[in-house]
Amino acid sequence: MRLDKLLVTRGFFSSRERAQDAIVQKTVSVDGTIVDKPSKETAEDAAIEVIDIFNKYVSRGGLKLEKAIVDFGLDFTGKTVLDVGSSTGGFTDCALKHGAAFVTAVDVGTGQLHPSLQGLPQVQSIENRDFRELTPEEVGGRRYDFIVSDVSFISLSYIIPYFAPFIKEDGQCVLLIKPQFEAGASFLNKSGIVTDEKGYKIAIQRVTQEAVIHRLYLNQINISTLFEKVKNVEFISLFSHTDTRYHLDYNVLFKTVKEVKKGLK
């Protein structure tokens, strides 16, 4: 039986989508071996163990930042972090659990930050505030080691121009690039999803070109965590003031996208 189906049959998950999420995240072992293919044929009496990663952070966003930390070899220990578009606080929670000393969480909404993060001495929550209107005085003139951002319904190209007063000269930016908010309406299907590689490329280029204008250079990029096969493809990216002459091979990147999508089928 397919592993994702078996996990539901044996009661590990309520749906195949959730089972697929867990498998792709490499949290399912079969007879002592981690399996990352939902379609893997598995004996019905196999010894299965599951690590519940979905309770690891206050939201799944934390898993996306965690992937950047692992893929890019980032060290948040003792660092200061500005979380732009913090929402529930997945990025904030992940940063703290990876050793960040202080996080300023900024969001245009109100009352979204998870209760477990509210009131923490190492978290400054600024609500009902468009980041583009944030002043250095509101954060005590602090410049941050990291700016992290997962925003929706707005292009990062409108956010990046406002990073300068808040980022240290040797700071880094971890940005989630969402093609559905970058590529333009012509690339969206009826479900509002970008599935075309040309759309992915345009989205990435829109962000990187705006970043260069503000002396922020792409250092690394990879596909972000995919949770369900119906969801948008997103890219986690790393920028800094250091031009590493990073060569983005779109063929390699999009090959990875295809492989991950195939694994979810």
Question: What is each stretch, according to the model?
Answer:
Residues 157-173:
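A short glycine-rich, Lys/Arg-flanked "PGG" loop and its adjoining helix->strand segment in the class I
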